[in-house]
Amino acid sequence: MAWKFTSDRPVYLQIAERITKSVLSGEYKPGEQIPSVRQLALEAAVNPNTVQRAFSELENNGLIISKNTIGRFVTDDTEILESCRNALAKKLVKEFMQNMNHLSITIEQAIKIIEEEKL
């Protein structure tokens, strides 16, 4: 089934974010090989060049590493993984707070809502 993309951001960034979330959630473990460009392109129903660009972005961030002709692997560097996790958490919190501000909800009110909705 093809992945769903939005028109507000480049597709390669959405693919990179999805892979990042898969890594940080543990779907792909540190040191584990990730699917190939062709596999992900078929799964996402996009051009392989788009997936390649997403992979380049992730390699630049240090989240994945390329091992010659063997393939691409999740880094096993815990500092990089933790840094990526913190960066993503900050981004999500910023987006959340922007949405709360649009609703005229204060930080205190947002915290109260979060505490009430703990999973």
Predicted regions and their residues:
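Extreme N-terminal segment that seeds HTH/winged-HTH DNA-binding domains in transcriptional regulators
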Residues: 1-33, 39, 87-119
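A short alpha-helical element within helix-turn-helix/winged-helix DNA-binding domains
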Residues: 33-44, 58
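Short, Lys/Arg-rich nucleic-acid/phosphate-binding segment
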Residues: 34, 66-74, 79
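Short, charge-rich, low-complexity alpha-helical interaction segments
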Residues: 56-64
